[in-house]
Amino acid sequence: MIGFLLLFFLTSSPAASTVVQCLGSQSMAKTVVMLLLAFALAGCTQLVTDVATVKDPGRYEVSLPGSGVTLGGILFRPASTLKLLPAIIVLHGWARPGVPGALRVEGTARLLSEQGYVALALSMRGWPPSSGWDDCGTQQPDDVAKAADWLATLPGVNADSIGVLGFSLGGQVALLSGSRSDRIKAIVAYFPITDVQRWKETTSNTGIRHFYVPLVCGNGYWNSPVHIAEQIHAPVLLIHGDRDTEVPTEQSLKMQEALRRADRHVELLIIGGGDHGFKGEQDEQAWSAATRFFNIYMKPGE
């Protein structure tokens, strides 16, 4: 908490100018911020920011505890408000090792922040700056549960209104996290993997079929949201393109069926002509549905 308040003081106006006056120079003020960042990289789990972020108010690079790992991400906070705000964790899809995961969904988190959400673009375990290894949804959902707990402690966050949005592998993890945390009140999953073994059999991606699933996912039964649908209590929106061959559309169709059998609330949006990713009007249609869904379940009465 102290770290957050200090960083807010250093990165806010007119507070920033006051710091400069006290320290004697802009460079000295930046040095203080860099020292805070270095402390964070040494293991601090409080809110931190770097010098580049000073030019982008409301954007913070963060480090937080996961389930036995340290997670990194980018947090966006809307302009100051007197009311508590809902928060959304944004999860990326699979990426080449070494690619910072949070950067892939930073733009999505920023857009959510502009709509009044505290938004955390999270690097899942296996992608920097988070530690650990990609595990195809084994412990990654526990990390998301820990991230939800962390968000709930931040000033200005409504601890009773936390959601998750994920893409592809991130969609799989978002769904699984709904069975690991009671804090999660809404889930939006873009073209998620929901049945790992069926995915292996039907994907057009030979790397997934011959390497990723056998080496990373294993049997994949408990990594498959379709098998634990009754444990997911949050409302779910599934979004999938009807021409997706990497994660075939049937993955969302089967998830919809499983959630309905479990008497859970689920909505499914099929994007005509959509592949494993959307463009132009497809993207607008999907985004409109996602934000509408979050607004209904996380901003009731507004």
Label each residue range with its predicted role.
Residues 253, 261-302:
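C-terminal catalytic histidine-bearing segment of alpha/beta-hydrolase fold enzymes
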Residues 100, 192-228, 234:
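Mobile cap/lid helix-loop segments that gate and shape the active-site cleft of serine hydrolases
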Residues 47-82:
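N-terminal cap/lid segment of alpha/beta-hydrolase-fold proteins
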Residues 171-182:
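Short glycine-enriched nucleophile-adjacent loop
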Residues 82-85, 93-131:
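Short substrate-entry loop that stabilizes the transition state in hydrolases
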Residues 135-155:
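Alpha/beta-hydrolase active-site loop
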Residues 232, 238-240, 244:
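Short beta-strand/loop motif that positions the catalytic acidic residue
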Residues 157-168:
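Alpha/beta-hydrolase fold nucleophile elbow
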